[in-house]
């Protein structure tokens, strides 16, 4: 079969300014997958930065062996779909990523997939309807409430109505604005003010009083619709749901144990500053309850593929913060739970053989990967483990067997030599560095995230963290190191 994996980008992107480097590279990972499924043709069709699919150096795409690489150039979904159709695909898999300021690439990829399906191509992609619900945070809030999922109480503020008198001179009294402030006064403070269409926590503000909310809504910061939510205190987490659509039209979701996220000084998880630890399958967090609820969520929204969920454990109950039907910054860590690489999981989705609970086929594939690549990164990312141990991990929902722990921590910019030196450590699984030459603020310049672990106790994970600090004292950032130590200590 001819398999096409695609993603798009609606933003201007200059590869001479923004540099992304991963170890192992996507070129290596996709070459390995294509080699192990050599009876199929692989096409990677993307727009830069082509996250999860392609590597690039300045403007040149680094092509993978045994893989056809195509740079998409269309603007509309119709144009992009035509480019993909020209590749004559049997299957097309969306590998959507995220951008700022609008988290709508999943929606664009869904429209492309819808056109492909209409033209007879089998796709693995979330529907346009699902993406539309999750793109707009107010629509998400309504969906969660209507379907009895726990989430924060919230008030939606329509920008045009809030300032209705500016465009309608006959308006003497803005009734809508009075209504909005009355509704906000009923919320428990503090509250979070967020854009209804922004990505993750970008632009969010924690506000502690009603006068402060008034000041915000009367400021230039308020320039589009906002969602004002109660701030739910508690530990923040994230996880992924991998969902297969069956031949009978039913859906089989697999919810992975959650990763714990650190928060910034405002109590918000920041993508550029967070430390992630997990997966955590602990009784005290009622992960069985979480799994059941998220399986229900996946079936109602009819997920197909990978979706990421942000959560908070508030007053001994799970609450949903955000739903992202796309790949995420946690996708590499989640793949490791399956002892796979992300490209391998996407390939199995394309071939219709992906089963998050399977053991026999997965073990066979993993062993082939490691046997044929014993001197490269596969030794780390696809560790060969006994069938009994693998089965115990996959069936942990019943046996409560502990999953191997991983930590995702961020470093300042590293040289390529430093990145490769870190990767020589046997427990370091993955590095990804983003560097923006045009940025002026420190946090905007980018960072290098390191994923390490694969051990079954927090003590062992802490020892790995200490080894990194000892061997690379010049690059580790103390604030992230201390946060990671505290998070690991919370499990001891």
Q: Where are the predicted features?
A:
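Glycine-rich phosphate-binding loop of ATP-grasp-fold ATP-dependent ligases
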Residues: 153-165, 190-216, 236-238, 263-282, ...
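Peripheral (often C-terminal) accessory segments that flank ATP-dependent C-N-forming ligase machineries
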Residues: 347-371, 378-379, 383-492
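A conserved helix-loop-beta module that forms one wall/lid of the active-site cleft
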Residues: 113, 117-203
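Conserved metal-phosphate-binding beta-hairpin within the catalytic cores
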Residues: 298-332, 387, 392-400, 410-412
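Short acidic-hydrophobic, aromatic-tinged amphipathic segments that line or gate anion-handling sites
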Residues: 67-76, 155-156, 172-175, 205-208
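ATP-binding N-terminal substructure of ATP-dependent carboxylate-amine bond-forming enzymes
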Residues: 1-123, 163-166, 368, 372, ...
């Amino acid at each position: 079969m001819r398999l096409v994996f695609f993603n798009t980008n609606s933003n201007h992107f200059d590869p001479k300014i923004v540099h992304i480097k991963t170890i192992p590279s996507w070129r290596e990972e996709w070459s390995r997958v294509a080699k192990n499924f050599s009876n199929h043709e692989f096409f990677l069709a993307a727009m830069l930065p082509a996250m999860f699919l392609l590597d690039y150096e300045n403007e040149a795409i680094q092509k993978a062996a045994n893989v056809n690489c195509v740079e998409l150039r269309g603007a509309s979904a119709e144009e992009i779909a035509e480019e993909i159709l020209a590749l004559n695909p049997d299957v097309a898999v969306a590998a959507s990523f995220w951008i700022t300021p609008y988290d709508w690439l999943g929606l664009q990829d869904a429209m492309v997939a819808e056109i492909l399906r209409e033209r007879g191509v089998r796709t693995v992609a979330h529907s346009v309807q699902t993406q539309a619900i999750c793109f707009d945070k107010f629509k998400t809030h309504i969906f969660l409430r209507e379907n009895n999922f726990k989430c924060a109480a919230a008030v939606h503020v329509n920008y045009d109505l809030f300032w209705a008198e500016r465009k309608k001179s006959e308006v003497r009294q803005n009734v809508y604005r009075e209504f909005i402030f009355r509704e906000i006064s009923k919320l428990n403070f503090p509250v979070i003010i967020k854009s209804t269409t922004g990505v993750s926590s970008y632009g969010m503000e924690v506000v502690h009083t009603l006068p402060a909310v008034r000041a915000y809504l009367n400021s230039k910061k308020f320039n589009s619709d906002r969602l004002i939510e109660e701030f739910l205190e508690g530990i923040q987490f994230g996880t992924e749901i991998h969902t297969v659509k069956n031949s009978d039209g039913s859906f089989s979701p697999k919810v992975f144990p959650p990763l714990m996220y650190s928060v910034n000084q405002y109590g918000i998880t920041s993508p550029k500053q967070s430390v992630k630890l997990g997966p955590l399958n602990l009784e005290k967090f009622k992960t069985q309850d979480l799994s059941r609820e998220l399986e229900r969520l996946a079936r109602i929204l009819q997920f197909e593929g990978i979706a990421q969920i942000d959560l908070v454990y508030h007053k001994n109950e799970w609450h949903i913060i955000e739903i992202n039907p796309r790949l995420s910054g946690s996708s590499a860590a989640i793949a490791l739970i399956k002892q796979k690489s992300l490209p391998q999981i996407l390939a199995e989705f394309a071939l219709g053989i992906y089963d998050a609970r399977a053991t026999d086929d997965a073990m066979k594939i993993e062993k082939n990967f490691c046997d044929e690549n014993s001197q490269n990164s596969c030794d780390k990312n696809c560790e060969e483990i006994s069938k009994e141990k693998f089965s115990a991990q996959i069936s942990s929902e019943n046996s409560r067997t502990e999953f191997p722990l991983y930590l995702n921590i961020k470093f300042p910019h590293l040289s390529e030599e430093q990145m490769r030196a870190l990767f020589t450590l046997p427990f370091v699984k993955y590095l990804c560095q983003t560097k923006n030459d045009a940025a002026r603020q420190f946090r905007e310049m980018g960072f290098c995230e390191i994923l390490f672990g694969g051990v079954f106790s927090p003590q062992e994970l802490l020892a790995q963290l200490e080894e990194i600090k000892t061997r690379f004292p010049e690059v580790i950032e103390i604030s992230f190191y201390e946060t990671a130590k505290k998070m690991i200590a919370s499990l001891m």
